[in-house]
Amino acid sequence: MVGIEEIEQGYAMGAGPFRMAFTWDGVRWSHALAFEGRLLASSLEMEPQRDDPARLISPAYQQFSHQEGGGGVQALLVGQWGPHHCSGVFTFEFQNPGVSIAVDVAVRSRGVIEALAATYLVQRTSSDLRDANASMMVWDLEGQKPSRLRFEARAPSVVSLAEGGRQATCIQANGRVESESSTQRLYYRWQWFPC
C-alpha cells in the first residue's frame, strides 16, 4: 500500500523501501527519491541568475497539496517562474511487486518556451545502467534485495542522459514544445521494482 507521512519541512510518499520526499526550502518545493533510506535522485531546480527563462530545466512549484484514494496517493503542485505557470500531478501507485510514480506536468505561459524538461541528479553512474534508450533508463540497485530503478518518458517526451560528476548522472525527461500552443505538456514516470 502506498502511503503519505509528514516529515520535517514537507511530506514523504511511497511504499516499502521506496519513497519520494517533497521538501519546502522557503521559496519552492523540490523532491527527491530514496531507497532503503539512501538518496537515489533529486530534482534540479531553476535558478534565476543561472538559467534562461525560455528554457525550463524543471517546473517551479510553490504550492503543495495531496489526496488519497483508489489504492494510491497524488501530490498536486503548482507554481510560477517568470511568465510560466506550472502544475504537476505525481501519482503514486503500488504495482505488485513495485511502486510507480507517474508525473503529468503542464506549463502555461504568456512568454516564450523554447524547452521544457524535468531534470534530476541520479546518484548512480553509467556503469550502474542496466538498459537505456531514448524513452527510458534502468539502473541496478544494491540493497537487502536486488532491485531496479526505471525512469521513462511517455511519447512524445524523450529521455536524455549526461554525466553529473564522478558518482552521479544527470537525466532529463524532455517534452516536445508546441509553438502554437500556450500550454506545454510533459509526461514521465519513475518505477522501483525488485529483480
What are these regions (language model features)?
Residues M1-P48, W192:
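Beta-strand-rich N-terminal accessory domains
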Residues V2-E5, G14-D25, C86-F94, G143-A153:
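Broad, structure-driven detector of short, well-ordered beta-strand segments within folded domains
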Residues E5-I7, A12-G14, D25, Q67-G71, ...:
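Solvent-exposed loop and beta-edge segments used for protein-protein assembly and interaction
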Residues W24-W29, L44-D51, F92-N96, R154-S157:
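A short, sequence-level motif marking secondary-structure junctions
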Residues E45, Q80-G82, S109-E114, L149-C195:
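Beta-strand-rich recognition/accessory modules
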Residues E47-R108:
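Extended, loop-rich substrate-binding clefts of extracytoplasmic carbohydrate-active enzymes
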Residues V99-N133:
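Acidic (Asp/Glu-rich), glycine- and aromatic
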Residues S127-R150, T169-N174:
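Long, charge-dense
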